[in-house]
């Protein structure tokens, strides 16, 4: 749990406080999605905790296939892949692995993840007091980002089978799978 500024955003000092709280003299893995504000604030937080002699590593999630083509993978947003990276990194840390090993496992997980979102309705961030985007009740948007960033397409609601097929086609086209995977 981390406190947020009044505008709903995160500040570097709050992230530095979270890093300090998490540190148990073994270093801290910063694991987050590829969003400009998060990168800026986590980088600044890392600089701040260097004064406390806290070692930090970073794994940046870029799993959202809707946000950039494969050849621009580094521009992709981080979305659902974070859940898996959190789980594998947490399990490795719980086993007592060192920071480098935990980071390597989280990075391998991040590199193996692909995701694509589907939006049916917006959420309302309490601090903002308004929906993050607008969409009609009979519409769907494939690939919308978690902050309401535009997706690949918006259209009339489709069946669950049609949506699943469209998502799987996009994911499987993007994933470097081979026999036995």
Regions found by a protein language model. Give the residues of each.
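Mixed-charge interfacial surface used for oligomerization/domain docking
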Residues: 67, 93-181
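Active-site histidine-anchored catalytic micro-motif
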Residues: 10, 23-24, 37-42, 53-103, ...
């Amino acid at each position: 749990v981390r406190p947020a500024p009044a505008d709903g955003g995160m500040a570097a000092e709050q992230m530095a406080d979270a890093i300090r709280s998490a540190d148990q003299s073994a270093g801290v893995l910063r694991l987050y999605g590829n969003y400009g504000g998060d990168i800026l604030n986590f980088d600044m937080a890392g600089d701040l905790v260097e004064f406390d002699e806290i070692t930090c590593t970073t794994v940046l999630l870029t799993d959202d296939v809707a946000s950039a083509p494969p050849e621009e993978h580094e521009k992709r947003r981080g979305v659902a892949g974070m859940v898996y990276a959190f789980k594998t990194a947490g399990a490795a840390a719980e086993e007592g692995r060192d920071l480098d090993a935990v980071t390597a496992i989280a990075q391998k997980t991040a590199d193996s993840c692909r995701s694509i979102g589907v939006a049916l309705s917006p959420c309302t961030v309490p601090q903002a007091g308004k929906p993050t985007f607008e969409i009609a009740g009979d519409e769907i948007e494939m690939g919308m980002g978690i902050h309401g960033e535009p997706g690949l397409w918006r259209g009339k609601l489709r069946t669950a089978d049609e949506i699943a097929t469209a998502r799987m086609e996009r994911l499987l086209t993007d994933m470097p799978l081979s026999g036995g995977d």
